[in-house]
Amino acid sequence: MLSKRSDKELSGRSCSCDELITLVAERMNRCAPFACFRLPGEGCAVHEIGLQHEARAVATTARELREREHLAGFLMAPFVVTAETPMLWIEEEQKEQGASVLELATCDEAELESFPPVAPIPQALPDSYRVTFARFIEHLEEGMAEKLVLAHRAELPSIATAQVVGAFDKALTHYPNAFVSLCYTPQSGLWLCATPEMLLRGDGMRWQTVALAGTMPRQRDGEPPLWSEKNRREHRYVQRFIGELLEQEGIPYRTLAVETTTTGLLQHLQARFALQLPEGYAPITLAERLHPTPAICGTPQRVAQRLILEEESAERSYYAGFLGWYEPERCVDLFVQIRCLQLLPEQSLRLYAGGGIVRGSSLESEWQEVLHKLSAIHSLIR
């Protein structure tokens, strides 16, 4: 385990939820980029960049990040880089070491309840999902891949920016062990994320990544989860992929025991990898090699990614990409962007979720898993 930030590092000025709503609205009205995020286990200590001081957002590449020195900023990468969805880098115009910290006070529930209720998630299985599922099964049975992750997005009308900020605040308490972020750039729009899945974390000496896969609804207290063979197989794919990649890269590691982790309404299987990066090895290089893992893409990695791009009916954009703080000389905290939503320019909401498909997968069971995942993020705003 990496150590948490020290009390001194986490000390910052207090900020009410109303003040955060005002700051976010003002920045978005000016198309001014910002990111605020809470690391797992850090309560309501919210790191921010661009809210108290001016920041800029630029398109970048892993190569550019490797070549620059003294980096300190927020990184948001898409599932696949395109002209419309570049890798984005947010940094303050007047550079200071690290991000500022806000101690966020809880939102006024009565004020948030004054907004119209958010529309429910459509429950009917859409034809687009049914068709792509059938195509994925064909590819799996033909032996082109062992696993393919099928994504779905649900669009809901009429939501206020304040409700998304309120959902961010709610996620801080409902998802204490998740990476929770609220990020805006003119290129990407506003994204809220409450993800359980780490991509890469480290402080220069100690590094770790995680194999996280398999999903089931949270069990009642005291009841041990009964993981299906399908879930265990999905998790083994991720474990195998990470282990083989680390060996190829010449990175020493050890794997910790598989355990069940709970985030909000859902449980997952996870196994942590403790790493030692060789001297001169840039963290962004490993992040780039790991992404996209079988947990959000499939296996083999590049074959699965190609099939997803060919078959899925809607683009993933920044869903199933990765994001977080990147300051390689001091600390790196990168996470996979799942359990997320996007506020669209017309104030409608787009929720994203996906599930792993293997040979023998059931269409109805997979659709129910997608609904469970959509409900997990939807529960923060309804």
Locate the predicted segments by residue:
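Short Lys/Arg-enriched alpha/beta "domain-start" segment
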Residues: 1-57, 154-161, 165
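An anion-binding catalytic pocket shared by soluble metabolic enzymes
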Residues: 28-48, 157-237, 270, 330-354
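Non-catalytic accessory segments adjacent to catalytic cores
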Residues: 51-158, 162-163, 223, 229, ...
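A short glycine-rich, hydrophobically flanked beta-strand micro-motif that places a catalytic Asp/Glu
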Residues: 73-76, 148, 180-183, 316-324
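Contiguous alpha-helical scaffold segments within structured protein domains
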Residues: 95-127, 133-134, 156-157, 210-310, ...
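Residue-level signal for inorganic ion chemistry
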Residues: 143, 200, 240, 304, ...
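A glycine-rich phosphate-binding loop feature that marks nucleotide/adenosyl-phosphate handling sites
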Residues: 185-191, 243, 258-266, 322-325
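Conserved hydrophobic core element of enzyme catalytic domains
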Residues: 277-382
